[in-house]
């Protein structure tokens, strides 16, 4: 099972809609900021904490960049 199949199956298991390709990219961009400005463990935990808030992915990305001290966005992920 590849990553997209696993994500789709996990979403179905918990009764959620699977993320779109754009949403996956945004989550990975958020994880990258967290991991690159701290330690690797920050990536999944930041995504979980952000998800608990209900904030948009754009708001979470901006917050991560403020915390990480980055003013650039990732277009290469």
Where are the regions a protein language model picked out?
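Amphipathic, hydrophobic secondary-structure cores in small proteins
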Residues: 17-55
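C-terminal binding/interaction regions
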Residues: 4-10, 19, 58-77
